[in-house]
From Swiss-Prot:
The lineage of its organism: Archaea, Methanobacteriati, Methanobacteriota, Stenosarchaea group, Methanomicrobia. This is Glutamyl-tRNA reductase. Signal peptide: none annotated. Pfam families: GlutR_dimer, GlutR_N, Shikimate_DH. PROSITE patterns: GLUTR. HAMAP family: Glu_tRNA_reductase. Homodimer.
């Protein structure tokens, strides 16, 4: 079976594999809805996936057009996958093979959320919707057959492991979690088993902080009291969705003045792990004496005792995804052919109705029976005339021969451009 696609599909991506936190911040799209609106004018379908360690743009369109669009957006440095390679990359994403923490589950929810946003803005066409749903299904199945997501496998849990490595143990420590979104929930869940003395949860919306704090027997913190609780904390893990830094140099320096406890022989170090994107903590906070600032870039070095198991499980996942790719291409091409055929049949139906009405107008005074027979006759003739064409286009789809199919449609329509190539 060929790996050619019947319609163009492209992914442009930047991730932790090739870029630092700062690099990803420079190309991030702060207003996702505005981006999708602009992209929707260029492509039949578009998905924007932005997480703490990757930005992926998936389009029903070709790589050259996507490259031109990104240049117009002032964004450069993207890695491109096109057609079958793009489908393969999407499967890797959904299965967690491309994640910083191999096998993590969060990517599935992030893909669903991205698709939902595109659907709500009417920029997810049937083909790109098929791609995301198929990838999510394959990713879920890959985890089921391999167990690759066994153990502590999330950016949130990796942040907790990093803090634990720096302090030796989190038992008896005071931890402040800033943010109550999906990542904040994962962080607090990972902390719940660490025998902490106290866990504080801060969020811009205090009710959400209270809700999460209650689940882990912690203390909700109003944002107005953030730096007072910073003074009492050994570790701060930051994971808000704020578009600007929340923890700033001057305020941290002030808070540190009251940080020593009466029985401390020396000033306790403050560990800050910033896993937000864009960053929650001003970069210069890491230069303050007594503060150790870590970002997503540092999570690559975390010693996770389940990593070796997941690496071995990844081999099983790879075999499964290789098989899934063949089916994925078949589904993709079938859906693309359906779209082309729907356009062709719609064009033919318009001609049928026009010619039927013209014939009936020449049969002045005809009764309903004549009208019904004429309608049936034109309908049957149209269907029969398109039968062989339909079969040929489906065969072209199986082979990924889009150009042959479009040339055939062009011959039938005498060059009338019923299949807009704007997105090719």
């Amino acid at each position: 079976m060929t790996h050619a696609l019947f319609s163009p599909f492209t992914i442009a991506g930047i991730s932790h594999h090739t870029a630092s936190v700062a690099d990803m911040e420079s190309v991030r799209f702060p207003d996702e809805e505005a981006f999708l609106t602009r992209a929707g004018d260029w492509f039949k379908g578009v998905i924007l996936l932005q997480t703490c360690n990757r930005i992926e743009i998936m389009v029903h369109g070709n790589a050259d057009l996507l490259g031109t669009f990104l240049e117009s957006e002032g964004r450069a440095g993207w890695q491109m996958w096109k057609d079958a390679d793009a489908l393969s990359h999407l499967l890797d994403l959904a299965a967690g093979l491309d994640s910083m923490v191999i096998g993590e589950d969060q990517i599935l929810g992030q893909l669903r959320k991205s698709l939902s946003l595109s659907e709500s803005m009417s920029v997810a066409d049937p083909l790109i919707t098929l791609c995301i749903n198929k990838a999510i299904h394959a990713g879920s199945e890959a985890r089921r057959i391999s167990g690759i997501n066994r153990g502590a496998v999330s950016i949130g849990s990796a942040a907790v492991l990093l803090a634990e490595e720096q302090l030796g143990s989190l038992a008896g420590r005071h931890i402040l979690v800033l943010g109550t979104g999906e990542m904040g929930v994962l962080v607090t869940q990972a902390l719940a088993a660490k025998q902490l003395s106290a866990i504080y949860v801060a969020n811009r919306t205090f009710d959400r902080a209270q809700c999460l704090a209650e689940k882990v027997h912690g203390t909700a913190v109003p944002m107005a009291d953030l730096y007072r609780y910073l003074t009492m904390s050994d570790v701060i893990i930051c994971c808000t969705a704020a578009p600007h830094p929340v923890i700033k140099v001057q305020e941290v320096m002030e808070a540190l003045k009251g940080r020593s406890w009466p029985l401390d022989h020396s000033r306790r170090p403050l560990i800050i792990v910033d896993i937000a994107q864009p960053r929650d903590v001003e970069e210069d906070v890491g230069k303050i004496p007594g503060v150790c600032l870590y970002t997503i870039d540092d999570l690559r070095k975390v010693n996770d005792d389940t990593a070796q198991f997941r690496k071995e499980a990844a081999e099983k996942v790879r075999e499964f995804l290789d098989q899934e790719l063949v089916q994925f291409i078949r589904l993709f091409n079938r859906k693309a052919a359906d779209e082309l055929l729907a356009t062709l049949h719609s064009w033919a139906e318009q001609i049928r109705i026009r010619e039927r009405d013209r014939a009936l107008s020449r049969l002045s005074g005809c009764d309903d029976r004549v009208r019904d027979v004429t309608d049936d006759l034109t309908r049957v003739l149209t269907r029969k005339l398109l039968t062989d064409v339909t079969l040929t286009i489906r065969t072209c789809a199986e082979r990924g021969e889009m150009k042959i199919a479009e040339d055939l449609v062009g011959a039938i329509t005498r060059g009338e451009n019923i299949c807009s190539r704007t997105y090719d």
